[in-house]
Amino acid sequence: MRLNELAPEPGSRPSAKRVGRGIGSGLGKTGGRGHKGLKSRSGGSVAPGFEGGQQPLARRLPKFGFTSRQQRYVAEIRLNELAKVEGDVVDLAALKKADIIREEIREAKVILSGELDRAVTVKGLRVTKGAREAITAAGGKVED
């Protein structure tokens, strides 16, 4: 047996529809498309989202907000993630090296979430008020 000799068991698959081969076949003349109308024509089909003249869903729902393009370049860092960085200084490069943020991130903000158990110096990152207090309470400092 070879790959080009593989075939399904006889009778296991229905034979293909042979359209337009005489009226006795049941699929002759109009070929299963009915009479006239958009869907009987070649290349004729309704546009995606068309609901037969009813107001489409996309137009029934209100417009709402927008997606910020800058969002993909800004990261949020929790306090417990700062502890994963090796060394005392935490900046963008150190966060990327520790695999905490993606390579394309341009700016990051430290937020008060989790706990910080060692002193670190945060450089060049934005820091929330609560996170700033937590960093200084742990013996670290924030440099802008």
From Swiss-Prot:
Origin: domain of life: Bacteria
Q: Which Gene3D superfamilies match?
A: 3.100.10.10
Q: Name one GO molecular function term.
A: structural constituent of ribosome
Q: Which keywords appear in this protein's UniProt record, sorted alphabetically?
A: Ribonucleoprotein, Ribosomal protein, RNA-binding, rRNA-binding
Q: Does the keyword Lipid biosynthesis apply?
A: no
Pfam families linked: Ribosomal_L27A (PF00828)
Annotated spans, Disordered = 1-58
Q: Which family does it belong to?
A: Belongs to the universal ribosomal protein uL15 family.
**NCBIfam families linked:** rplO_bact (TIGR01071)
**Protein known as:** Large ribosomal subunit protein uL15
**Native organism:** Marinobacter nauticus (strain ATCC 700491 / DSM 11845 / VT8) (Marinobacter aquaeolei)
- The organism's lineage? Bacteria, Pseudomonadati, Pseudomonadota, Gammaproteobacteria, Pseudomonadales
